[in-house]
Amino acid sequence: MSENKRIGIASFDSGRGNTMKIIFPKVEEDCLSKYYRFNPKSYKGSKYSKYLNKFYKDRESWNAICPKIEEGRSFESYLKIDGLNTQEEKDVFAINKLNNDFFGIAIHHSGNGGLNTMKKIQNDHINGDNQRADISYHFGVSLSGEVLEGRPIGIKGAHLTKYNTGIIGIVFLADFKHDWWDVDDDMSKEALQSIITLIKALKEQFPNIGTLGGHKEWKNNTDRTCPGEYGLDYIKALRKELKLKSPKETGNG
């Protein structure tokens, strides 16, 4: 059997003298090469970035497919890294640029729709009703404590309504809206420790970040229930622990 991942075609002999071709979703290889991706090992990474790197999972680890970039699906890059050859060159250029753009972090939960993996969320965001170019969040945090790469950090997120510029999106792969009629999740020690490490690592590389809020706390998004009242209690505690302000305090709520 031969594969051509660049065009998403697999061909094989059917056993009857005929060659059959199957078109399948294109698994990532170089389709993100011109977009900047978060690098825990960058020159700006210090204590927390290095620790994060021990349990950080890139997109390839969860078999992400290439973004579906077409008219009507936003995939807006904050910067261009074309012509930069080494990872160090990309880090130096991108981190300086993105530090001027990033000011906040929005935290979400995946909710009760069964979308409890990055792969399921990406599939829903690309092929579901919203027809997005890629998974909307920049990072996912599992209850087991994994931190998973989502949308490249150099690409504007699609996780808030009309308020994504300068805001990094993180989703807990859990349901923190505790309703009596369905099965919900409790925060785990592992997930809490991991999101603290992730946020501290982001602050190391992008020190202008000063605002942290749940989905429903951001301007244009106050009608949302995400990340649930239970999840919001933890976000308030995270703000206190990390010495960050709420969207309302910084004029963004």
Locate each region found by the language model.
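Short connector loops at helix/strand junctions that flank enzyme active sites
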Residues: R132-S136, S142, Y163-I167
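Glycan-recognition patch characteristic of GH18 chitinases/ENGases
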Residues: G114-D134, G140, R151, D186-Q193
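Short, Gly/Ser/Thr-enriched beta-strand-loop segments that form substrate-interacting elements
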Residues: E146-G157
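Active-site acidic/histidine clusters and adjacent loop/turn architecture
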Residues: D91-A94, L98-D129
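Short, surface-exposed glycine/acidic/tryptophan-bearing loops
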Residues: I155-G169
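Basic/polar, cationic surfaces and motifs that engage anionic cell-wall
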Residues: S2-I105, P152, G166, D175-G253
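Short, flexible loop/turn elements at secondary-structure junctions
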Residues: H109-G111, F139, L143-G145, A174-F176, ...
